Each structure stands twice: as C-alpha cells, then as structure tokens.
Amino acid sequence: MRSDMIKKGFDKAPHRSLLKATGLKDEDFDKPFIAICNSFIEIIPGHKHLNEFGKLVKEAVRAAGMVPFEFNTIGVDDGIAMGHIGMRYSLPSREIIADSVETVVNAHWFDGMICIPNCDKITPGMMMAALRINIPTVFVSGGPMAAGKTSKGDVVDLSSVFEGVGAYQSGKISEEELKDIEDHGCPSCGSCSGMFTANSMNCLCEVLGLALPGNGSILAIDPRREELIKQAAEKLKILIERDIKPRDIVTEEAIDDAFALDMAMGGSTNTVLHTLALAQEAGLDYDMNRIDAVSRRVPHLCKVSPASNWHMEDIDRAGGISAILKEMSRKEGVLHLDRITATGQTLRENIAHAEIKDKEVIHSLENPHSEEGGLRILKGNLAKDGAVIKSGATEVKRFEGPCVIFNSQDEALAGIMLGKVKKGDVVVIRYEGPRGGPGMPEMLAPTSAIAGMGLGADVALLTDGRFSGASRGISVGHISPEAAAGGTIALLEQGDIVCIDVEERLLEVRVSDEELDKRKKEWKRPEPKVKTGWLGRYAQMVTSANTGAVLKIPNFD
C-alpha cells in the first residue's frame, strides 16, 4: 500500500507513535489510509451541512474496512463575493484548493481519497488535485439546493434575486416584492438550484466518471444522498483493489463526454474554463476547437434555470443525469460508452437502466431545443483565441451594435444603473481577465441589472472576465487574448460596431486590420491593479482563459 511509507518497518516507529496519538491501533496499520477531503464552511450555504456529511463518509469508510482521516479546504461563495473585491479571489481560490489538497495528501501518503465538494471553485479545485495526485478517488458532492417559492407562489432562485435588484432599480417591482424574492430565493442548504456553475461542475464530475450516478442531481436534503455516501466508500475500496486512478478515468474521451452533457444541458460557461484546467492536470492536449466540435454534434435537450423555470430537482425527478446520457447515447458518435468510471463499471453499464420520466424537462433527440449544443465557442478578430457564449440562455442569435466601453465591472454597473446603456448597445467590460482583474471576476451583477431592467434581449455584453452560471442574455465572456495581454478588446473605442453571430460562431469588430494595428502600437498596458499578496502573485503567473487560466511554472533554465 502507498501508506506503508509512513506505517511499515522498524524505522517508522516515530510515525506510528504519532498516528497512535490520533487514536489508531496496531491493527489499523494493515488497512488502507483514506483522505476525506471536506470543504465544510459555515458562510457558504452549499457547504454548511458538509460537517455532517464528513461524519457519514468516515463511518462508511470504516465500515468498508479502511481508516479515514478528514481535513478541510478553503472555499469562496461566489454569490456573497459578487460585486466587490471578493470576486477577485474566487477563481484564484481554485488553485489554492488544488495546491492544499495536493499538499496534505502527498505529505501523508494516503492510499485513496473521497472528496466532498459542492460549490463553484471547490469542485474543480479538488478535481484538479485528484488528477495531479492520481490516487484512487471518488467524489460525492453536497447536492443541489431546492428552488424557492415566493408568497405569490412564483418559483425563484438566486438568479431571481440578482435580477430583482435590477427590476427594483428600474421601478418594475416594489421594495416589498424584492424582499419577498430575497427571503425565498435560497430556501435550503445546497448548491444554488439552477444550472449554475456549481451544479454544472457536479454534473460534469458524474459524467467524467469521478463521481457516482446521482451525484449531480440528488438534492442536498434528500436521504438518497446518504446512500450515495455509503456507495462511495464501497466503490473506493474496489478502485484501490483494482488500482483504478483518476487519470485512468479522465481521458480525452471522458472530457468529450463531459462537454457533450454540458452542451445537452446548456451548462455554465465556467465549465469551459475548469474542464480545460482539468485537461492540463491530466496531461491531455485539449483545446477550444475540440469543444466547438462537440457543440456541433450534440443537441440541446434540456433547459434549466436561468434558461427556463426548471431546476435541478426537476432534472432529478425526470431521471437525472443518467437519463440525459441514455437519451444522448441513442445518437451515434456522441458518447464514449465503454470507458471506465468510479463505479468500477463502464459508462454504458452505469446508464443501462436509466429512462426519461418527464419529456417536458428532458427532451428527446427527436424534439431538442436546438440541433446543436447550449454553449458555443466564438472566434474572430475580437477573440482570436476564442470566447464563450451560453447560447441556450438567449433566443437572439445575431446582434450588431455600437460599443459602450467600461474598464471595470464597478464602472459598468454604475453606468448601467445610471442609464448610460440603451437598447441596441454592446456593453464592453474589459481589464477583468485572469491577469487584468486579476482573478477573472464574474459579471453577474451587470447581466442581472440588464435583465432586470428589461433589456436582456436588446443589449449585448462582452467581457474578458467570466459570467456566473446564473447569467443569461447575449453575454459573451472569456474573450482571449484578454485586454491586459493586449488583446483586441483593449483596442476598442466608444462607438465601434461589434457583430455577434451565434450561428456562424463569429465575434467581430467592424474596424480594419490597419486601424487595429495602429491602435495596438499606441496602446499602453495599464499598471496592475494589485501588486502584493496572493492576487499580485496570481496575476504574474496565470495563463489565458483559453488554456483554463491555470498557473504557469516559471522556466528556471
């Protein structure tokens, strides 16, 4: 066993003595040591119940004849961090999480790991660590939150609350109505109830094969999640016995399938960023062109909030992720069904008995929302390395208009609220990329303000930053190269005409190459917004969004 490094041999007497101080007995040194990587934190509603989850996981690991050791990672709640400097720490926290898990697990030579994530950056951070460490691992997330209902019976979620702010600001609802939405938008523990980033990543974790069937859709408060925990411990023991590791599971084909599900569900645009980072950790050559190829062959089968009024509980009721995959498997060339997963079985075996129970929620191949996926990769002179749009969350497929340029999210939000944006405009928020932000903050507040003011179908928004999974409308993010790297978005001037063509996958500014070259020569890189601390270091080391915004290791040659 891997853990023999710290528990076997006469020279490990000091190690065993320390381990006995934690409560271990001599007989425990013949059992696998299992890291329980938890992310309990009280300020995040998606994680406030994970302390109890950790206890259940440890009980299940002991029952399976192994020895559990629990530790915690940090976490950032993107909703609470939204709209202020806290959002700059969200994406960088993914790297801290990955590094901290790597540190604890490799320092103590665990034989296997169970990860308990839930919200936005915690899940991909742990997945990156699992691929980096590469020991048998099973994920079991905390589960989605239930949707809420206002006193009028309207179904609401966190997206409704953000959009309610814009609606109140524009006089469309009263303060009492906003308070009603606020009080009911987040009714329970769990990851926010729509197809936002957290739920998108937990669903992708399931289809990748690192988590068990049901992981993405079973609610946090559903007793079936406790059964999932028991299964996770049992399956981990099998993975250890068979020496099946994350890099055996997360292959190029598995990532294809993850993006296929993403396209079928119209997931968060952040999945592109995080899954590209996973590919980097797995040592795979995977780029945005391959994502685009998946998008072209996968139909959009279900719309979940913010693209509709359906939520994760509805997906679960309709058959869950397995039912979506089973329906997708009917189309040749969409899924790779014979690859291994954390169940110890193939994807084909995992979904064999799944079926759609509500075709209003999960559409059939014969009745898709669209013939192509709910995410699209755009390219053009404004995004030479690519950009991402959640095409399933807007009915507008082509938009052309003049730029209204803001050099920060705060500046943009103030401008939108003051009425500086009108129908037909293209809002540009730049210098908010991985390096320029720094931290590539999400633009949920501006998109929600636009939607809440009734301009969602009449105003486009472009940024080198990110969007929350709760964002909707004509929102194009992850524009690469970013402004801080001298990308074309930095060269835009007020009034330039921009064209967004979703069907043709184009993002263009109607300015000649000669004029752009002239502007590039005159452009000067702004001073970094942050020069000290973690964000200062992050800004110096982070790569572009089109490669997952991972940290680059300096060349010491």
UniProtKB/Swiss-Prot annotation:
Cofactor: [2Fe-2S] cluster; Mg(2+)
Chain positions recorded as Mg(2+) binding sites: D78, D120, K121, E442
Known pathway: Amino-acid biosynthesis; L-isoleucine biosynthesis; L-isoleucine from 2-oxobutanoate: step 3/4; Amino-acid biosynthesis; L-valine biosynthesis; L-valine from pyruvate: step 3/4
Any one GO cellular component localisation term in the record: cytosol
Signal peptide (from-to): none
GO MF term set: 2 iron, 2 sulfur cluster binding; dihydroxy-acid dehydratase activity; magnesium ion binding
Nuclease as UniProt keyword: no
Active site, UniProt feature: S468 (proton acceptor)
Residues where [2Fe-2S] cluster binds: C119, C192
Catalyzed chemical reaction(s): (2R)-2,3-dihydroxy-3-methylbutanoate = 3-methyl-2-oxobutanoate + H2O; (2R,3R)-2,3-dihydroxy-3-methylpentanoate = (S)-3-methyl-2-oxopentanoate + H2O
Keyword field contains Lyase: yes
Swiss-Prot/TrEMBL keywords: 2Fe-2S, Amino-acid biosynthesis, Branched-chain amino acid biosynthesis, Iron, Iron-sulfur, Lyase, Magnesium, Metal-binding
Residues where N6-carboxylysine is found: K121
GO annotation (BP), single: L-valine biosynthetic process
Subunit structure as annotated in this protein's UniProt entry: Homodimer.
Function: Functions in the biosynthesis of branched-chain amino acids. Catalyzes the dehydration of (2R,3R)-2,3-dihydroxy-3-methylpentanoate (2,3-dihydroxy-3-methylvalerate) into 2-oxo-3-methylpentanoate (2-oxo-3-methylvalerate) and of (2R)-2,3-dihydroxy-3-methylbutanoate (2,3-dihydroxyisovalerate) into 2-oxo-3-methylbutanoate (2-oxoisovalerate), the penultimate precursor to L-isoleucine and L-valine, respectively.
Name of the protein in question: Dihydroxy-acid dehydratase
Gene name as annotated: ilvD
